[in-house]
């Protein structure tokens, strides 16, 4: 989302949450999107990739933080990003780990630091059997 009107359009067709990517927005633009989402009673998942973006998101009082483990310059994924940033996030915030999650061990490592929400795309999209892949991911994970 880059224009508040997109939020209004999204709400009109039933959306209840928007994605605000700090890497592509100024603080002013992000604030405008967050305010518009709140005005339209929508949640906002504020996505960060590093500590600088996290600091900016927190300064905007974001409460739903998505930590994207994918480096946008190299497209390399590393869940250490989530593990490193989680302790810097206040307990009042809900954290979603995004990208690079492909095993139940990954989810366990994240769960052990208090992250219990995950955005999993690529590993499931590449799976021949999505149901079996999802079951394998969740086996042994206590959420």
Task: Label every PLM stretch briefly.
Residues 1-3, 16-27, 40-54, 66-76, ...:
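Catalytic beta/alpha-barrel core
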Residues 2-13, 49-60, 97, 101-120, ...:
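Catalytic cores of alpha/beta
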Residues 7-29, 67-75, 113-134:
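Glycine-rich phosphate-binding active-site loops on the catalytic face of alpha/beta enzymes
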Residues 14, 36-38, 62-65, 83-84, ...:
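Short, hinge-like loop/turn segments at secondary-structure boundaries
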Residues 40-42, 92-93, 138-139, 143:
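Short acidic, glycine/proline-enriched helix-loop-strand junctions
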Residues 58-86:
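Glycine/Thr-rich beta-alpha phosphate-binding loop at enzyme active sites
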Residues 82-86, 90-96, 103:
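Catalytic alpha/beta core domains of metabolic enzymes, predominantly
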Residues 84-88, 111, 126-143:
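C-terminal helical cap(s) of enzyme catalytic domains, especially alpha/beta-barrels
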